[in-house]
Regions:
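N-terminal mature ectodomain segment of secretory-pathway/periplasmic proteins
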Residues: 20-92, 120-158, 162-168
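Surface-exposed amphipathic alpha-helical segments
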Residues: 162, 169, 173-192, 296-318
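Pro/Ala/Gly-rich low-complexity, hydrophilic intrinsically disordered segments
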Residues: 180, 185, 192-212
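Acidic/charged, solvent-exposed loop-and-adjacent secondary-structure segments enriched in E/D, K/R, S/T
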Residues: 88-110
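Bacterial N-terminal signal peptides that target proteins for export
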Residues: 1-7
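Short, solvent-exposed recognition patches
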Residues: 204-290, 303-307
């Protein structure tokens, strides 16, 4: 009898592990579908008490993927993706600035390309079923293992694995940012003119021919003070335009979900330590360390960013 009970417990444990692995596979597929699934739809973006509406179309496969999102309210702007290239378009400079800000969070592609290390800092749990844009979806909650990060909730359509709704919540359970499809068809437009820009003023956010950031000889030799789980992905050093003697070191860290950029540049004037919200869940913190101005940008809570910028210790290579 005891052996039978023990066998039953073991089988239950194996089943639970298999179910957990299946859930992580769903999230991995959701990260791919969020960038590659052909679609035509409309979505809402809610943050900081404001609401924006965008129309999005996407078609093609692999390097030929094209995507265009157009604002339906607020400043007129377009964000167009062709393969790896990402460009903002607008009728005037003010609207172009708004387009650059909107491009910080390109729903439904909220998850990073590679989520291989995500389980170190987050747990995954199914939290029920829902219906979004007349489609069934399953809630997948990525809960941080500490209070320094946001909770990310995704409602994933079970056939395509496309996230139909994404909510970012703080430790108190309040929604910091929310994206929701109101209309969605899982096919792209047949007419290629749907991907053409309407406006002439543009700004290239990411060039298809841009060199990839790698760990180089000028990267900092040591960075401490990051929350657990963050690893250095890549680093680069650049000179400022027209100021060859002034260089900026840029490093990108990730915990498998959050992408965190660290900028180090020579300090030229006194700036107070501060943390500010840039856009939705994206915050920025700055502080002076010796002769350098240090800036952090990422989708972490403002208190976390401020604590990090205070505790960050950077040792530069000679």
């Amino acid at each position: 009898m005891r052996l039978t009970q023990l066998s039953g417990v073991c089988l239950m444990g194996v089943a639970m592990l298999a179910h957990a692995d299946d859930d992580w596979l769903v999230v991995k597929r959701a990260a791919v579908a969020a960038r590659q699934q052909p679609l035509t739809g409309t979505y809402l973006h809610q943050m900081n008490g404001s609401l924006e509406t965008f129309r999005i179309v996407r078609g093609g496969t692999g390097d030929t993927i094209q995507e265009k999102r157009t604002s339906l309210d607020g400043p007129s702007r377009e964000i167009i993706r062709k393969g790896l290239e990402l460009t903002c378009y607008a009728p005037d400079a003010k609207s172009l600035s708004a387009a650059k800000i909107s491009a910080m969070r390109l729903f439904p592609a909220i998850l990073p390309d590679d989520i291989g290390n995500i389980a170190q800092s987050y747990t995954l749990k199914r939290s029920g079923k829902d219906r979004v844009a007349q489609r069934d979806c399953n809630w997948m909650d990525l809960k941080p293992r500490d209070s320094k990060r946001y909770l990310l909730r995704l409602c994933v359509e079970p056939v395509s694995n496309l996230p139909l709704k994404v909510i970012t919540q703080n430790a108190a359970g309040d929604a910091v940012e929310q994206f929701t499809f109101t209309e969605i068809e899982l096919q792209g437009p047949k007419d290629k003119s749907a991907f053409r820009p309407q406006y002439k003023q543009n700004y290239v956010l990411r060039s298809a021919n841009a060199p990839q950031m790698t760990l180089d000889a000028d990267a900092p030799s040591e960075v401490s003070g990051m929350p657990s789980g963050f690893k250095l992905l890549r680093a680069v050093q650049r000179s400022l335009p027209g100021q060859a003697e002034r260089t900026i070191r840029h490093m990108v860290f990730s915990d498998g979900l959050v992408m965190l950029s660290l900028f180090i540049e020579p300090q030229t004037d006194g700036r107070a330590e501060r943390a500010v919200n840039l856009h939705g869940a994206v915050n920025m913190a700055t502080a002076v360390q010796g002769d350098y101005l240090v800036t952090l940008v990422g989708d972490l809570p403002e208190p976390t960013m401020l604590a990090m910028i205070r505790n960050l210790k950077i040792t530069l290579k000679p």
